[in-house]
Amino acid sequence: MIIVVGIGADGMTGLSEHSRSELRRATVIYGSKRQLALLDDTVTAERWEWPTPMLPAVQGLSPDGADLHVVASGDPLLHGIGSTLIRLFGHDNVTVLPHVSAVTLACARMGWNVYDTEVISLVTAQPHTAVRRGGRAIVLSGDRSTPQALAVLLTEHGRGDSKFSVLEQLGGPAERRRDGTARAWACDPPLDVDELNVIAVRYLLDERTSWAPDEAFAHDGQITKHPIRVLTLAALAPRPGQRLWDVGAGSGAIAVQWCRSWPGCTAVAFERDERRRRNIGFNAAAFGVSVDVRGDAPDAFDDAARPSVIFLGGGVTQPGLLEACLDSLPAGGNLVANAVTVESEAALAHAYSRLGGELRRFQHYLGEPLGGFTGWRPQLPVTQWSVTKR
């Protein structure tokens, strides 16, 4: 059995009697250097510090035989090693004794409800994944440099007036809180930030809605326009944790919107044009999502993480591309393809005749001035084919 004991900045004094007894009876305890240093002299077990990288060492543990003990920060099941151990060895082989999490402590200090506060971990993720356009979050830092890195990004993307609080050594005798704005922290960061810190951010509210308008994206005209983007996302039907392949991504607007739809949604964007690939990267960073940007399809398919859903927004008439997309889909996965030319529309109609699914055609109009009046200007019709792989 692997017993995981959560410990806070207050060390042994903050632990329950059950947690203290487990540590005192242990023969071997694994943990980080900081966590192991929190144990007192009543713990006589041999102490093993995790190496870097840590995962191979974790995978080498064996829950069979004598009990193994692991110390972890706060609640080990909240972006912690407890979740990793259960995934590797099963819940029957892992017992978790949680401590109060840094998230709970930070919310208590800020006066925020935990249930409606987003939690973002930057322990291994890039800082741009914590950029938001409104709301509030507790951000778990990777190290002392994380607050400045996030503050700089928020400032660069027009969110510099976001309320920005850095809370260090939560629950311990050296606890400290510093309040300000992202801009102030980016311009004049303190030099004495503790490695053990979290960031409480109240993001500057963006005027733009969650369905971002076309002008919110960097693009050269190759973008799924807003009304069709809404219809396309409805057809793609994202669910939490799914991965999208955006093939012929253009600006990456579909990939970005997909990643913003549900927690855990990720995307891989395939685009042959280098300038457009740069736009996709810029748009992903601006919206605080992570999109894996790759080259031309289908050549770049081989080493990409497998998709749950595929959107084909360009290249419908490219020989073999539609078939390669279908081959890459798992059984039960959805493919949605849009077409605006007669040739690409014919290709989708042919695919529909062979494979079934649903074939739709959308036509929308925009009201525009016509002299002293208003007239309707038709936009290009869009044909959409969606199919579930059997």
UniProtKB/Swiss-Prot annotation:
<dbReference type="InterPro" id="IPR000878">
    <property type="entry name" value="4pyrrol_Mease"/>
</dbReference>
<protein>
    <recommendedName>
        <fullName>Precorrin-6Y C(5,15)-methyltransferase [decarboxylating]</fullName>
        <ecNumber>2.1.1.132</ecNumber>
    </recommendedName>
</protein>
<comment type="similarity">
    <text>Belongs to the precorrin methyltransferase family.</text>
</comment>
<keyword id="KW-0489">Methyltransferase</keyword>
<dbReference type="InterPro" id="IPR050714">
    <property type="entry name" value="Cobalamin_biosynth_MTase"/>
</dbReference>
<dbReference type="InterPro" id="IPR006365">
    <property type="entry name" value="Cbl_synth_CobL"/>
</dbReference>
<keyword id="KW-0949">S-adenosyl-L-methionine</keyword>
<dbReference type="Pfam" id="PF00590">
    <property type="entry name" value="TP_methylase"/>
</dbReference>
<dbReference type="GO" id="GO:0009274">
    <property type="term" value="C:peptidoglycan-based cell wall"/>
</dbReference>
<dbReference type="GO" id="GO:0008276">
    <property type="term" value="F:protein methyltransferase activity"/>
</dbReference>
<dbReference type="GO" id="GO:0009236">
    <property type="term" value="P:cobalamin biosynthetic process"/>
</dbReference>
<dbReference type="InterPro" id="IPR012818">
    <property type="entry name" value="CbiE"/>
</dbReference>
<dbReference type="InterPro" id="IPR029063">
    <property type="entry name" value="SAM-dependent_MTases_sf"/>
</dbReference>
<comment type="pathway">
    <text>Cofactor biosynthesis; adenosylcobalamin biosynthesis; cob(II)yrinate a,c-diamide from precorrin-2 (aerobic route): step 7/10.</text>
</comment>
<dbReference type="GO" id="GO:0032259">
    <property type="term" value="P:methylation"/>
</dbReference>
<keyword id="KW-0169">Cobalamin biosynthesis</keyword>
<keyword id="KW-0808">Transferase</keyword>
<dbReference type="InterPro" id="IPR014777">
    <property type="entry name" value="4pyrrole_Mease_sub1"/>
</dbReference>
<dbReference type="GO" id="GO:0046025">
    <property type="term" value="F:precorrin-6Y C5,15-methyltransferase (decarboxylating) activity"/>
</dbReference>
<dbReference type="InterPro" id="IPR014008">
    <property type="entry name" value="Cbl_synth_MTase_CbiT"/>
</dbReference>
<dbReference type="InterPro" id="IPR035996">
    <property type="entry name" value="4pyrrol_Methylase_sf"/>
</dbReference>
